[in-house]
Amino acid sequence: MRTSYLLLFTLCLLLSEMASGDNFLTGLGHRSDHYICVRSGGQCLYSACPIYTKIQGTCYHGKAKCCK
């Protein structure tokens, strides 16, 4: 009986982690916007992009700009 409670508790923890979506999707190959920006040669900035760079996208779920 104690084993079944332990398995149920583990399942609940696993499902609660999957409910957030971010970590679960990243683990399945969906990359975050920060990763895509840096991988393409950009940098994530909360302030305005420096001179001679353009906004190429967003970072941190749209809270910052990807400058390249």
Curated annotation (Swiss-Prot):
GO molecular function: CCR6 chemokine receptor binding; identical protein binding
Cystine bridges: 37-66, 44-59, 49-67
Primary localization: secreted
Any GO BP: calcium-mediated signaling
One GO term describing the cellular component: membrane
Prosequence residues removed at maturation: 22-32
Signal sequence interval, chain numbering: 1-21
Compartments in which it is found: Secreted; Membrane
Gene3D superfamilies in the cross-refs: Antimicrobial Peptide, Beta-defensin 2, Chain A (3.10.360.10)
A Pfam family that the UniProt record links to this protein: Defensin_beta
InterPro entries associated with the record: Defensin_beta-like (IPR001855)
Domain of life: Eukaryota
Keywords, in A-Z order: Antibiotic, Antimicrobial, Defensin, Disulfide bond, Membrane, Secreted, Signal
Family statement: Belongs to the beta-defensin family.
Subunit and partners: Monomer. Homodimer.
Function noted in UniProt: Has bactericidal activity. May act as a ligand for C-C chemokine receptor CCR6. Positively regulates the sperm motility and bactericidal activity in a CCR6-dependent manner. Binds to CCR6 and triggers Ca2+ mobilization in the sperm which is important for its motility.
This protein's name: Beta-defensin 1
Name of the gene this protein is made from: DEFB1
